[in-house]
Amino acid sequence: MIERVRTDLYRIPLPTRLTDSTHGAMMDFELITVRIEDSDGATGLGYTYTVNHGGAAVATMVDKDLRGCLLGADAEQIEKIWQSMWWRLHYAGRGGHATSAISAVDIALWDLKGIRARTPLWKLFGGYDPVVPVYAGGIDLELPVADLKTQADRFLAGGFRAIKMKVGRPDLKEDVDRVSALREHLGDSFPLMVDANMKWTVDGAIRAARALAPFDLHWIEEPTIPDDLVGNARIVRESGHTIAGGENLHTLYDFHNAVRAGSLTLPEPDVSNIGGYTTFRKVAALAEANNMLLTSHGVHDLTVHALASVPHRTYMEAHGFGLHAYMAEPMAVTDGCVSAPDRPGHGVVLDFERLGRLAVG
């Protein structure tokens, strides 16, 4: 039985200024942590994040709206608790803050389940292969070409064997020149992806895809807004590229509709905003049923368990906004891969003493 729920909010400065085509400059991110303690004293940890804004709203949803779904509930009945949270928040918001709040709780519940079972989550989820290929997600739209190459060299030195860069500069020629320079720097066979962060119109995305065709991109991510299913389906048909998307699809139904419409070819859920492991695994099943590979967005220390448990995964995104500095045992990248930890639960241990100096409110 769940006895205690603790929610904390932290504002964590980013190691460097990050920029993409839609969100502008990012100077910090907000980390929302949820700790759930059962009557036997075991505690599960979950977390989600926002960039620059919105963290207080997520934390408040957990504290004021979801706490009632948790206290006194059987922590083993995760699906039942998930449904209770979903319908409690359904009218207030079916995505964004609502599913981020649900995610943090759901992740904590699964962590608690793994801890009590003394089993890592990737095994609890069925187990496939703990070694997962990763790519370095650069948030680098404003970097000059020389710095872009330096960043790539740093990624390579850190063990990465695949890289994603940002596109969506005001002039398409700038994007072409930057991608060309990095492709030449990395070599023709190196897996290189690009992310437009929804910057382009449908016609603009098709023009950009054709202009970038010579560089043999592994995929193009979020070429336009995900809400335009018809437009994205046209991009899929006419671009000649694999089209990834999902960080802004926040429900199972969003992914179902996108897959049914043919508006993406590579689903990319984020376990910290999709509704936690519970929904992520349903999206994984949806992808498998439609003969699609599966990637992910963000929080790779958590995501690795979900991808290590399925056969149809491809490269997992690895970026943590500097959160590794506050982890006891962050995952290391070796020859382009990370290994899911064998510790019970998800195995992430945060240094709350250090984080305490960054607490908000």
UniProtKB/Swiss-Prot annotation:
It catalyses: 3,6-anhydro-L-galactonate = 2-dehydro-3-deoxy-L-galactonate. Its cofactor is Mg(2+). Gene3D superfamilies: Enolase-like C-terminal domain, Enolase-like, N-terminal domain. InterPro entries: AHGA_cycloisomerase, Enolase-like_C_sf, Enolase-like_N, Enolase_C-like, Mandel_Rmase/mucon_lact_enz_CS, Mandelate_racemase_C, Mandelate_racemase_N_dom, RHMD-like. Mg(2+) binds at D195, E221, E247. GO terms for biological process: amino acid catabolic process; carbohydrate catabolic process; galactose catabolic process. Involved in the degradation of 3,6-anhydro-L-galactose, which is the major monomeric sugar of red macroalgae. Catalyzes the isomerization of 3,6-anhydrogalactonate (AHGA) to 2-keto-3-deoxy-galactonate (KDGal). The lineage of its organism: Bacteria, Bacillati, Actinomycetota, Actinomycetes, Kitasatosporales. It is an enzyme of class 5 (isomerase). The active site is at K166 (proton acceptor), H297 (proton donor/acceptor). Pfam families: MR_MLE_C, MR_MLE_N. It comes from Streptomyces coelicolor (strain ATCC BAA-471 / A3(2) / M145). Its EC number is 5.5.1.25. SUPFAM superfamilies: Enolase C-terminal domain-like, Enolase N-terminal domain-like. It comes from the Bacteria. Keywords: Carbohydrate metabolism, Isomerase, Magnesium, Metal-binding. This is 3,6-anhydro-alpha-L-galactonate cycloisomerase. Belongs to the mandelate racemase/muconate lactonizing enzyme family. The AHG metabolic pathway may provide a useful platform for the efficient production of industrial chemicals and biofuels from red macroalgal biomass. One of its GO terms (molecular function) is isomerase activity.
